[in-house]
Amino acid sequence: MARDTAILRVTGFVQGVGFRYTTKHVAYKYDISGTVKNLDDGSVEIHAIAEEENLNKFIDAIKKGPSPGCRIEHVYIYKGAPVEDRKTFDIVY
């Protein structure tokens, strides 16, 4: 099956609350490869690659807020965006 890509930019109270750590666990659940990192503006950026169905489930989970302490304001989704092909899902520091 073909793998789809997406870049997500998540705004709100998403840094310092375990968001990247729990996002990594959600990525494992849906067989997502890619990265998650904090941005200087307080948002989080996620690069994701997976089969379409799993990618959509992952995006839905992110919209709900994977970390209990986070408060999501908005999730900007750029499907089909160029993403580095990876075998794992990693937190970028």
Curated annotation (Swiss-Prot):
This is Acylphosphatase. Keywords: Hydrolase. SUPFAM superfamilies: Acylphosphatase/BLUF domain-like (SSF54975). One of its GO terms (molecular function) is acylphosphatase activity. Disulfide bonds: none annotated. The active site is at R20, N38. It comes from Listeria innocua serovar 6a (strain ATCC BAA-680 / CLIP 11262). It catalyses: an acyl phosphate + H2O = a carboxylate + phosphate + H(+). Residues 5-93 form the Acylphosphatase-like domain. Belongs to the acylphosphatase family. The gene is acyP. The keyword Transcription regulation does not apply. Its EC number is 3.6.1.7. It is an enzyme of class 3 (hydrolase). Pfam families: Acylphosphatase. It comes from the Bacteria.
